[in-house]
Amino acid sequence: MGRRGVTKKRNRIDRVKTRVVVLGSTGSIGTQALEVMADNPERFELVGISAHGSKPDVLAQQVRDFGLDLGRVAVASEHTAEWLDGEFGAHCIRGKDSARELVEAVGPELGECDVILNALVGSLGLDATLATLGTKAKLALANKESLVAGGQLVLKAADEGQLIPVDSEHSAMAQCLRSGRVDEVDSLVLTASGGPFRGYTRAQLEDVTPLQAANHPTWSMGQMNTLNSATMVNKGLELIEASLLFGIPAEKIDVTVHPQSIVHSMVTFIDGATIAQASPPSMKLPISLALGWPDRIADAQPKLDFTEATDWHFEPLDDEVFPAVILARQAVTAGGTMPAVYNAANEEAAVEFLNGRLSFPRIVDTVAATMEACQHLSAEPNDLEDVLAAEREARAKAHERMATWLSD
């Protein structure tokens, strides 16, 4: 017997499985999350999923692989829901509010769920985020747009430690911030790969195509996130999210271009020390950390190999060619629902670009013009309807501005 009665079995830890619901299960983050859970069956149990329904075969295979009860599967598409019912001889949750309805059906007070991963795309994820926080389940948040749009509304709904970031940058910051107190932070540094158009001029960007924008140099992501990375709007959204999550003013959050995407974020403290989190570019590490927080999951992804010669390069972001980050700082400073305006305008402009009707630089031009037209929307929202109203106005203003360019 060892000291204090500890035997040779001291490394054994009896764990209760963490029960997880994944919203957006057929997307890039969702599918990787399911892979993490499949690789760690002793740690995680999948109890529910939601999806839009645009990939019915993938969705059906997930149901089979994890032996899910169809009553814990939510599908936005009525057509896919009917097909799924026929495949399994049961009834799934369906309709545009199905993700929220799933969340409300499996909260921890009902004894079914511990963690809900919100991997939905766009500000449509806000409703599910607020519903999750209401259940008191841990929220693993990959849907950055819901925090950007909801702002203080989301933060006020969250209990201490309830909201865990999944974005690689914010996961990295959360890890780095363990090295000191928030009042000891001098600045946060977000890293950006630079996207497929790093080094381009504004004139060169005029002719880029949606196919070119989809070719990210280091990350494999969904269509919208890949486009946002190309415009640097993704980095603007991450700046807003970091300011909200960690309580750091926007002017103390910097962005640097790091093409290798190995250093995911850094925190500089008041004594001059800079703490960085580095790992190969893979979302499985931040996903596994969010699902298991605060514990780490062994072998979540390959480790860096320092026996090989490696160069890590950093350079400043060209704000004149890529002004999205400057606009994001302005949105944080304006406050209220201005971050929601920023996001909504981008969502509308991105669709026009992807459909071949708007040039690439006009995406961020639309965001700037919409923010200018919506300066009065700087009051803090009282409820979800205030956010939705601001988004509706922003989307309308964005289309008014784009119409002048589309008619040229």
UniProtKB/Swiss-Prot annotation:
SUPFAM superfamilies, alphabetized: 1-deoxy-D-xylulose-5-phosphate reductoisomerase, C-terminal domain, Glyceraldehyde-3-phosphate dehydrogenase-like, C-terminal domain, NAD(P)-binding Rossmann-fold domains
Binding site for NADPH: 26-29, 143, 145, 222
Binding positions for 1-deoxy-D-xylulose 5-phosphate per the UniProt entry: 144, 168-169, 193, 216, 229, 234-235, 238
InterPro entries with a match to the protein in the record: DXP_reductoisomerase, DXP_reductoisomerase_C, DXP_reductoisomerase_N, DXPR_C, DXPR_C_sf, NAD(P)-bd_dom_sf
EC number: 1.1.1.267
Cofactor(s) needed for function: Mg(2+); Mn(2+)
Catalyzed chemical reaction(s): 2-C-methyl-D-erythritol 4-phosphate + NADP(+) = 1-deoxy-D-xylulose 5-phosphate + NADPH + H(+)
GO terms of molecular function: 1-deoxy-D-xylulose-5-phosphate reductoisomerase activity; manganese ion binding; NADPH binding
Cited NCBIfam families: Dxr
Family from the record: Belongs to the DXR family.
Protein name: 1-deoxy-D-xylulose 5-phosphate reductoisomerase
Gene encoding the protein: dxr
